[in-house]
Design a protein with these regions (language model features):
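Non-heme di-metal
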Residues: 1-273
């Protein structure tokens, strides 16, 4: 069995000793952006294990996921957790994360994967587009240099993951003869799921520890979520997100020109709001 390959960077490369705590400590939006990301990334083994098993008999996909993708995803969680611990040392991360994980585990089941491997690869392209978008935006909006560095590193990893998933998708699309309509439905459904699933759960569980009196206040939680989405929306290039999402459709250029506007509006109203 092949040994796992070291990630492209290490947590030790991050300069936590130079963290500008004054720039982070009182920034409520930054706290939730970093903490929610740390929860979701730290739970990566729940879904990476399912995906590794789903492609177990494909040596190339299985090996890459096991030796590269999974360790890199888990390192993202460890690095973000370390950042939260340095920036907000009074926050009980472990307790809040355990509470989040108990709920999150219900949404990381193998039966929730797409019905074919090509469509699951298309769904992964959506997820990697979302994570690359979020971390690129976080790197731009963060006022604290260490988080800027960390978010930039994670964004680069996610873009690299997207490239692999897209390559695997093309191979499976050819083998399964999956049409554009099924791919489009998968892309749309997974985009909608991104809008409603992970972040709201993470916000609730972070708030329970950060601001117990606010945890049951729906208006407060909605405000936090809106602030996070606004930070992303103001600090990204929608054109890049659009190209990444549309790429699996392999549309001819004239058709792409026709459908680009409605897809762009869909992304703006669902993916970025």
């Amino acid at each position: 069995m092949a040994s796992r390959v070291s990630p492209r960077w290490r947590i030790e490369d991050l300069s936590f000793s130079q963290l500008a705590t004054s720039a982070a400590r009182d920034d409520e939006n930054l706290f939730y952006l970093a903490t929610c990301a740390s929860f979701i990334e730290s739970g990566a083994d729940l879904y990476t294990g399912n995906l590794v098993n789903y492609f177990r008999d494909d040596e190339e996909v299985f090996g890459w996921r096991r030796d590269h993708w999974e360790p890199e995803e888990l390192q993202h969680g460890e690095a973000l957790r370390s950042y939260v611990a340095h920036a907000w040392p009074d926050f009980d991360w472990e307790s809040a994360y355990r509470s989040f994980l108990a709920e999150y585990a219900n949404y990381c089941k193998v039966e929730l994967l797409a019905p074919t491997r090509a469509l699951e690869m298309a769904a992964r392209c959506v997820v990697e587009t979302g994570t690359a978008t979020n971390y690129t935006a976080l790197a731009r909006c963060a006022t604290e240099p260490v988080l800027q560095d960390l978010a930039s590193r994670i964004a680069a990893d996610e873009i690299n993951h997207y490239k692999h998933f897209y390559r695997f998708f093309r191979r499976y699309r050819e083998a399964e003869s999956v049409g554009r309509t099924r791919v489009l439905v998968t892309l749309g459904r997974r985009t909608l799921e991104l809008r409603i699933e992970d972040a709201p759960r993470a916000i609730r569980h972070a708030a329970k520890s950060r601001c117990p009196a606010c945890a049951g206040d729906r208006a407060y939680l909605r405000s936090v979520g809106a602030g996070m989405r606004a930070a992303v929306r103001k600090n990204l290039h929608p054109g890049t997100t659009l190209k990444m999402l549309m790429r699996p459709l392999a549309l001819p250029r004239p058709v792409q020109a026709v459908v680009q506007y409605p897809i762009e509006k869909f992304i703006d109203n669902v993916f970025l709001r």
